[in-house]
């Protein structure tokens, strides 16, 4: 937990090494989650990238009420669901135009 606190603090201070460490620590696990919602590795990569952008922009909102991994996982799942909804709308629009 202390390591997580230091990691979060470093990321919030803009420390690139800490940001890379956070990404490297969780990216492979989160990619697996993204793959469950995506139709391809490319889509999963897009979801992962978008999710980590949200993680880094909202990191100051993390309240230590649960694990950092759980918080990141929730962001990834929500990002993936939003991606699927957006893709479904594009698919429906494409069908309507044919």
Regions found by a protein language model. Give the residues of each.
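Short, solvent-exposed positions on alpha-helices
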Residues: 17-21, 42, 46, 70
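Sigma70-family region 2
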Residues: 12-13, 52-67, 86-88
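Arg/Lys-rich amphipathic alpha helix in sigma70-family domain 2
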Residues: 60-63, 74-94
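N-terminal module of bacterial RNA polymerase sigma factors
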Residues: 1-29
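Amphipathic, Lys/Arg- and hydrophobic-enriched alpha-helical face
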Residues: 23-41, 58
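Structural recognition of an alpha-helix C-terminal capping motif at a helix-to-coil junction
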Residues: 32, 46-53, 57, 66-78
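Solvent-exposed, non-membrane alpha-helical residues enriched in polar/charged side chains
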Residues: 8-9, 20, 31, 35, ...
């Amino acid at each position: 937990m202390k390591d997580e606190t230091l990691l979060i603090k470093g990321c919030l201070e803009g420390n690139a090494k800490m940001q890379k460490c956070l990404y490297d620590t969780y990216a492979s696990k989160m990619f697996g989650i993204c793959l469950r919602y995506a139709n391809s590795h490319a889509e999963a990569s897009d979801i992962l990238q978008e999710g980590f952008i949200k993680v880094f922009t909202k990191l100051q909102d993390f309240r230590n009420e649960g694990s950092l991994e759980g918080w990141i996982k929730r962001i990834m799942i929500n990002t993936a669901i939003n991606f699927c909804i957006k893709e479904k709308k594009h698919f429906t629009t494409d069908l309507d135009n044919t």
